[in-house]
Each structure stands twice: as C-alpha cells, then as structure tokens.
C-alpha cells in the first residue's frame, strides 16, 4: 500500500480505525480479534448503528508503533467478510 502516512505520523502514536460492516453481533468481536493479533491490549470499541440499522460502525484506537502495523491492520480489517469499509 503506497501512502504518505509514514511522512505524516510520528511513531508511536494513537491511531483510530473506523470499521463499517453489516449489523451482525460478531462484528465487534471480529474487529477486536484482528486488532489483538497486531496490537495486543485492552480495547473498548465505540459502536454506532446506521440510521436504518443495517450497518454498524466500530471505532477502535490502537497505539501504533510503525507504519507496517497500520497498513497491515487496514488490509486485514478490510478482509473480514462482513466489513464493507475501513477508514
């Protein structure tokens, strides 16, 4: 992934992901499971439903230590079957 994030960020730094996916009960657990593999810690994600209730957005903040960690998490979070978008 070619990004300029490395030029913009100074590591270690807090980094928030916003993951949007289908409103399924397992969404939060799947997001936390992926994050735990690359940035172990205690997480309390914020969950917001869409106006029609079909989707949920899950915001989770990690303490990023390097750009590869940030990029890998973008890719792996996006690979979750019920995830539609990662910001």
UniProtKB/Swiss-Prot annotation:
Domain of life: Bacteria
GO cellular component: cytosol
Gene3D superfamilies from the UniProt entry: 3.30.70.260
One Pfam entry name: DUF493
Family: Belongs to the UPF0250 family.
PANTHER family on file: UPF0250 PROTEIN YBED
Name under which the protein is recorded: UPF0250 protein ESA_02696
Organism: Cronobacter sakazakii (strain ATCC BAA-894)
